[in-house]
Amino acid sequence: MTLENHYKKLYHESINKISSDNYHIDTLIDSKNDRRFGLTLIIRPSNEIKKKIQNFLKNFKEIEPNQYYYPNSDIHITVMSIISCYSDFDMSKIDVQKYIDLTEKCLLKGIDLNITFKGITASPSGVMVQGFMNNNELNDIRNRLRKEFKNSNVEQSLDKRYLIQTAHSTIIRFRKELSQKEKFLELLDNSINYDFGTFKVNKFELVYNDWYQREQYVKKIHEFVV
């Protein structure tokens, strides 16, 4: 299945669930007791693209002000969840340098990767921007990460939740019941091909993060310039 068809399938399946009130309300977003943390390799889109995302979100905020909208500081693409978030993960108990070294081996110099953010898709939990890669570089990196980490003796949980192959970015999460569901779905449908632009990937970040990649909890472990 092509990436475009994957996003379309996900969109239609999720819209059906949202329409029939089978969507997932995240009750942990506002919880003071959420102790889920992990280790993730991420890409951050350009400031220009983040500005377009915030402009895009304005109309949704007017219709559904009580949902969770990602600020610019938290918008990201997950390259790989190296340690998927779990309660009370303690970074002091791992050898951080080993994670940096293993990751660096997988990020070859001269990577030529552009990502186009065009259109939106959905999940039963929220709304995502569709990301399209100009080549196989990103998935090649993921395959190298899988090989290196699975052949190592460090703690890891690659692909534990799902086999990641996309370049999407979550921008809305449902934290309350949709108060104007029909208007929200109509706006989604009208925005399905929204063009956010293209950016060149020139760095990757290895971060310690909470489930939502919120700035106040994220600690940058290492930045890899490619």
Model-derived features: positions:
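Histidine-dependent nucleotide/RNA phosphoesterase domain, centered on the 2H-phosphoesterase fold
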Residues: 1-226
